[in-house]
Regions:
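A mid-sequence, solvent-exposed acidic-amphipathic segment
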Residues: 149-192
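A short beta-loop-alpha structural element at the N-terminal edge
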Residues: 1-3, 132-145
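A structural microfeature
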Residues: 45-46, 109-111, 189, 255
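Conserved GNAT acetyl-CoA-binding A-motif
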Residues: 81-92, 229-241
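Acyl-donor-binding surface of acyltransferase catalytic domains
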Residues: 51-129, 257-263
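Conserved active-site tyrosine of GNAT-family acetyltransferases
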Residues: 98-101, 246-247, 251-252
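Conserved donor-binding loop and adjoining core beta-sheet/short helix segment
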Residues: 4-81, 183-184, 188-204, 209
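Conserved glycine-rich acetyl-CoA-binding loop
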Residues: 63-72, 97, 206-220, 230-232, ...
Length: 269
């Protein structure tokens, strides 16, 4: 979590790491490819990881920009991936970007945008008459929660139910920071948010069930979640997205992550 306080790590918030370990799509057979780096005192100072699918790999997260540490991290990826290695790095990570360039890597393409919302701004919202916002202390129904996410991200059919232990595997999840717009006992929109301490809260991409869109529910769900994080000490909220919706409700570009590789490297996103 200390890594999350550094702006060059904001494209891979700790919430992504916790969520992937609970996700049913996690490539569990690749978990041994995750590498931790420790300093002489045993503190974790570096992480090489992927996000849920091993195809989305090459994230280098670090709390120290010492050359020796970054050298070890780069060499570890090269030993695993060979010359086809791709590393996903925030443009704010000036030291790591410079070292990659010196080693013959090139910036390939953008692989993520981080948007930021200043929580000192107004977070007021309106709810249509037919809808209510889930209160603090709300015990979400797991099936309704799953349906809201499934439909809200435009998936067809009926999903296979999550295992009972699914959400229990997330150690720092805060149920009060999950918000739902509800009508007639149906969860119509949902925003999940991750926060423990520090300045930054992490917003999951908001989901609205198609037949309930264009009613301000997504904005309401995001603003309510951010209001609750602000009350706990957060000063800003970030989301990994470049959708116009977030700009319309006050988010602004904070940083971008790029894939770095050599001429013969793979071109995975």
């Amino acid at each position: 979590m200390e890594a999350g306080k550094l702006d060059y790590n904001e494209h891979f918030h700790w919430g992504r790491f916790e969520w992937m370990h609970a996700h049913s799509f996690l490539d569990e057979d690749k978990l041994t490819r995750i590498v931790l780096f420790k300093d002489e005192n045993g503190a974790i100072v570096g992480l090489i990881t992927y996000d849920t699918s091993y195809d989305d790999r090459g994230y280098l997260i670090h709390t120290s920009s010492e050359k020796s540490l970054l050298e070890r991290m780069i060499e570890t990826v090269l030993e695993s991936e060979g010359l086809g290695a791709v590393m996903k790095v925030n443009a704010k990570d000036a030291v790591l970007c410079r070292m990659l360039r010196e080693k013959g890597f090139e910036k390939k393409h953008k692989c993520g945008s981080v948007l930021s919302l200043d929580l000192s701004n107004s977070l007021e919202y309106d709810m249509p008459d037919a809808y209510t916002m889930s209160p603090r202390g709300f015990a979400a129904d797991p099936w309704q929660y799953q349906l809201a996410i499934h439909k809200g991200f435009d998936n067809d059919g009926i999903p296979e139910k999550w295992e009972d232990a699914f959400l229990k595997r997330i150690p720092h999840g805060n149920e009060d920071l999950k918000t739902f717009a509800i009508a007639h006992n149906e969860y119509c929109a949902h925003c999940g948010l991750w926060y423990t301490t520090g300045d930054t809260a992490y917003v999951e991409p908001v989901a609205t069930v198609p037949e309930h869109r264009k009613r301000g529910l997504a904005k309401a769900a995001v603003y309510e979640a951010c209001t609750r994080a602000k009350a706990l000490g957060a000063k800003r909220a970030i989301v990994l997205s470049d959708q116009e919706f977030y700009f319309r409700i006050g988010f602004a570009l904070s940083s971008e992550a790029y894939a770095w590789g050599k001429e013969d490297s793979a071109d995975f996103d």
